[in-house]
């Protein structure tokens, strides 16, 4: 189609570019005249492409079209006019001229907010839904028939800039292109605008952007954000006009400490605090503004209002002087109307506009090795000298957010360079433990030290809890929209996937996990877990509940599902990353902050995870990782008054101690995933080949270091001998070796103390009369390797029949053919109830057994088949509470009932 593009701005330019990509012929571009010698982006692009560009200062005089302007337009013979953003009045002779007429982009859901300040009014009136309309132009003001509309959620702290950049700009470009496509195909609708809900809102200008303080805080917040950045909501303090930017609304809660600032007309003094300027409405609620701009254009952080001028000017190095001159040249290119850029030259007073801010930020990024400034930084340093000082401080790392500094341990292993953090991770930074205390973490494959790891002390634990508490109560995490929190968790999962091979390699050398298993399960399921729970972030919701009415009044009761606060998580060594993911993903999804203690013997993937969390944009203090002794860290977290929840996976005796400490300290919420002795019942009518294969997996998976491992196999007598024979044959085929070798089936046990316990466990089994059919001893090679082991003739009173080995030890007992209730009684005769399994082709038998088994998980004709969507957790002394699935969220949420009478 032959199209005339009429408009201006970056938005107009992007629509123009996309129309060319679609194959349309742009016959002409009509834009505004150059300003201070600078062409509008739309016109500049079209001129480069050789498209005819017209820069009429006006199309009409005294309400009448200028004939020569109209003739120049008509000569192009356009079939459609596209007006992506146009500040000029276009005569109807031009609007109606093309075959298909004209379409216009408008940034509101028409008929609401007609007029030139639609985005401002969407926010000022507190609309929950925003969006844009592409409509057919007519002789009214934004009254033409609707072609298409797109909606978006308006976030509580959205400003004109944020909603524009997040949705109205990118989706608006797509919407304009789609509208043209529909017209070209002959499918474009014409829907009459409804009269109901129609509004026309006047244009927002500086003179009518003065704040009215006699209204609720939320209305003041909406007014400020609705005028952010243009024209800027303002008030007068000490005979000086102050303009406010970056408002956030805080409902309820005590006001923070701060220095009072009297504001004429306000219900109470504002407070200058470390987080910004706290303002109050006439309802006593509060809002906080981040930045203040003075009449001369200078912007400062609101928290700095009472502070003295910046410290003495920096002395620039020779290299920094070169950067300064390059930036001076960039200012000169932007401010073409200024003959010389002096140190005192003010960017905005010299004629710069908001579009020039974007350009300057990009120029600095190009000249300063990717240094990323924000638009606000330009407003806060408007004079050239101030701007250079700010840029140099950023380049030196003296200003802005603290840079993440990591003292990596680097290893050339598994055909890659592995970079491993080894310090405590507290409040978004890696740091040494108090006193520089550390310990060696050991590679179980050969018994050598991988690296020194910081050993957390009491003061470190308290510092981490304080950081988590601050992040929860005052940080961005607690204010964040749940959907935005989900985006961060998705990003974290993506980064874990990008580093999957590195994480799996670290897991292999630190825990002994076979690399191929680490890729699929240890790391792969961790990624799946974060993705699954990221999707839950914006789906946590309460209920409305019918209650008896207090007649003649009425009542409404609803529930809120709220995060608990600071959560302590203590995880075991068998799946170091996966156990972190199972608990932490649900915890973060619910909106909590976390202090996590990895197992002392396997801390490295947790620390690598901490690094990735920073790169994903998780705010500081939300995640804290403390390697060290469980007796110190776990106990302190259980006792700490600011920790409100403990999630623990580990042994039953330690779980009991944690539960006791949580009760005595502050009655913390607790979830426990403890020991197991999971029974696997195999009936004679099973698929024996599958039962042998899955039976081996149930015991030897991950070297037996598996909380749900089948701790005891009950075999129906008629298949006992054949089953044992086949299992022994298959075990002999298993390759024991280096976990990084892709052909290895069975790697080393996790650590030396565990290996010694396995040796002792098997010696006890032999002493009590168990028949050691295979294995039972350490492999004669360096490292902590233990042979896959098989015991038969194990009777119910034996130690190995009751206690879990947590290793590759298969315990086999017989039961009489057909004695279903008898074997169920034996299987349930345990204080544990984590998992269980049954193999049979008889569906009635399978359902009966699954009903009667006293375990949190029952596998039928399979084993180890866990999934991120299925709840996981035990009965009896295997603990309580669930990991995974929707139920896991309950462990990290509290329910509040709210009853209203009206």
From Swiss-Prot:
Which GO-annotated molecular functions does the record name? aldehyde dehydrogenase (NAD+) activity; formyltetrahydrofolate dehydrogenase activity
Q: Where in the cell is it found?
A: Cytoplasm, Cytosol
Q: Which residues of this UniProt protein bind (6R)-10-formyltetrahydrofolate?
A: 88-90, 142
Question: What InterPro entries does the entry give?
Answer: 10_FTHF_DH, ACP-like_sf, Ald_DH/histidinol_DH, Ald_DH_C, Ald_DH_CS_CYS, Ald_DH_CS_GLU, Ald_DH_N, Aldehyde_DH_dom
Q: Which domain of life is it from?
A: Eukaryota
Q: Which residues form a coiled coil?
A: none
Q: Name one Pfam family in it.
A: Formyl_trans_N
Provide one Gene Ontology biological process annotation: NADPH regeneration
By sequence similarity, the record places it as follows: In the N-terminal section; belongs to the GART family. In the C-terminal section; belongs to the aldehyde dehydrogenase family. ALDH1L subfamily.
This molecule's function is given as: Cytosolic 10-formyltetrahydrofolate dehydrogenase that catalyzes the NADP(+)-dependent conversion of 10-formyltetrahydrofolate to tetrahydrofolate and carbon dioxide. May also have an NADP(+)-dependent aldehyde dehydrogenase activity towards formaldehyde, acetaldehyde, propionaldehyde, and benzaldehyde.
What is known about its subunit structure? Homotetramer.
Query: This chain belongs to which protein, by name?
Result: Cytosolic 10-formyltetrahydrofolate dehydrogenase
State which gene encodes it: aldh1l1
């Amino acid at each position: 189609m032959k199209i005339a593009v009429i408009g201006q701005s970056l938005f107009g330019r992007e629509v123009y570019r996309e129309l060319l990509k679609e194959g349309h012929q742009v016959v002409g571009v009509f834009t505004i005249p150059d300003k201070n010698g600078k062409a509008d982006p739309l016109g500049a692009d079209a001129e480069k492409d050789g498209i005819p560009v017209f820069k009429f200062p006006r199309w009409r005089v005294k309400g009448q079209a200028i004939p020569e302007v109209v003739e120049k337009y008509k000569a192009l013979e356009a079939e459609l006019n596209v007006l992506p953003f146009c500040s000029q009045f276009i005569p109807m002779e031009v609007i109606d001229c093309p075959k298909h007429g004209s379409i216009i982009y408008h940034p509101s859901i028409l008929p609401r907010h007609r007029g030139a300040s639609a985005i401002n009014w969407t926010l000022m009136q507190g609309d929950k839904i925003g969006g844009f309309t592409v409509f057919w132009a007519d002789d009214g003001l934004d009254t033409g028939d609707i072609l298409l509309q797109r909606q978006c959620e308006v976030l509580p702290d959205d400003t004109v800039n944020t909603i524009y950049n997040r949705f109205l700009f990118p989706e608006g470009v797509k919407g304009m292109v789609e509208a043209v496509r529909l017209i070209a195909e002959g499918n474009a609708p014409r829907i009459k605008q409804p009269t109901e809900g129609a509004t026309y809102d006047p244009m927002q200008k500086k003179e009518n952007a003065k704040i009215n303080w006699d209204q609720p805080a939320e209305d003041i917040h909406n007014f400020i954000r609705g005028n952010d950045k243009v024209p800027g909501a303002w008030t007068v303090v000490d005979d000086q006009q102050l303009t406010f930017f970056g408002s956030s609304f805080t409902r309820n809660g005590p006001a923070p400490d701060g220095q009072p600032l009297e504001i004429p007309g306000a219900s109470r003094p504002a407070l200058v605090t470390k987080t910004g300027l706290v303002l109050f409405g006439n309802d006593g609620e509060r809002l906080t503004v981040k930045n203040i701009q003075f009449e001369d254009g200078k912007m400062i952080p609101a928290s700095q209002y009472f502070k003295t001028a910046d410290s003495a000017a920096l002395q620039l190095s020779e290299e920094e002087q070169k950067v300064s001159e390059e930036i001076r040249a960039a200012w000169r290119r932007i401010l073409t109307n200024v003959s010389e850029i002096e140190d005192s030259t003010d960017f905005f007073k010299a004629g710069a506009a908001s579009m020039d801010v974007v350009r300057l930020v990009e120029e600095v990024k190009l000249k300063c090795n990717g240094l990323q400034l924000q638009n606000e930084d330009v407003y806060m340093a408007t004079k050239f000298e101030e701007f250079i000082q700010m840029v140099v401080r950023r380049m030196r790392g003296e200003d802005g957010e603290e840079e993440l500094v990591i003292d990596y341990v680097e290893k050339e292993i598994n055909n890659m360079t592995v970079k491993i953090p080894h310090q405590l991770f507290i409040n978004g930074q890696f740091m040494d433990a108090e006193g520089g205390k550390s310990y060696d973490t050991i590679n179980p494959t050969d018994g050598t030290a991988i690296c020194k790891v910081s050993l957390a002390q009491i003061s470190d634990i308290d510092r981490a809890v304080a950081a988590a508490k601050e992040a929860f109560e005052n940080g961005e995490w607690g204010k964040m929209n749940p959907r935005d929190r989900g985006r961060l968790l998705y990003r974290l999962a993506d980064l874990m996937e990008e580093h999957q091979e590195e994480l799996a390699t670290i897991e292999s050398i630190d825990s002994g996990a076979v690399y191929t298993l680490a890729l699929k399960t240890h790391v792969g399921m961790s990624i799946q877990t974060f993705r699954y729970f990221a999707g839950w972030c914006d789906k946590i919701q309460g209920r409305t509940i019918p209650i008896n009415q207090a007649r003649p009044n009425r009542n409404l009761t609803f529930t809120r599902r709220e995060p608990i606060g600071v959560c302590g998580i203590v995880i075991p060594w068998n799946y170091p990353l996966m156990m972190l993911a199972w608990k932490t993903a649900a915890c973060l999804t619910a909106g909590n902050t976390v202090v996590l203690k990895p197992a002392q013997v396997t801390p490295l993937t947790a620390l690598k995870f901490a690094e990735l969390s920073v790169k994903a944009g998780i705010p500081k203090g939300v995640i804290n990782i403390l390697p060290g002794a469980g007796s110190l860290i776990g106990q302190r977290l259980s006792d700490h008054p600011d920790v409100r929840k403990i999630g623990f996976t580990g042994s039953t005796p330690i779980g009991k101690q944690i539960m006791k400490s949580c009760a005595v300290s502050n009655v913390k919420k607790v979830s426990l995933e403890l020991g197991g002795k999971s029974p696997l019942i195999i009936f004679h009518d099973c698929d024996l080949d599958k039962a042998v294969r899955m039976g081996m997996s149930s015991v030897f998976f991950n070297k037996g270091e598996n909380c749900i491992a089948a701790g005891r196999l009950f075999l129906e007598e008629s298949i006992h001998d054949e089953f044992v024979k086949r299992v022994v044959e298959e075990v002999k085929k298993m390759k024991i070796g280096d976990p990084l070798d892709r052909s290895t089936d069975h790697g080393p046990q996790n650590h030396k103390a565990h290996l010694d316990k396995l040796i002792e466990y098997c010696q006890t089994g032999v002493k009590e009369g168990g028949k050691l059919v295979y294995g039972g001893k350490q492999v004669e090679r360096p490292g902590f390797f233990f042979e896959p082991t098989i015991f038969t003739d194990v009777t119910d009173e034996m130690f190995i029949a009751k206690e879990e080995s947590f290793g590759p030890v298969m315990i086999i007992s017989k039961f009489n053919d057909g004695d279903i209730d008898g074997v169920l009684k034996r299987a349930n005769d345990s204080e544990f109830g984590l998992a269980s399994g049954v193999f049979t082709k008889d569906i009635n038998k399978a359902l009966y057994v699954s009903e009667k088994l006293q375990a949190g998980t029952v596998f039928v004709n399979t084993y180890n088949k866990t999934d991120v969507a299925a709840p996981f957790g035990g009965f009896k002394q295997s603990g309580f509470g669930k990991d995974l699935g929707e139920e896991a969220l309950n462990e990290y949420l509290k329910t509040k009932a709210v009853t209203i009478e009206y």
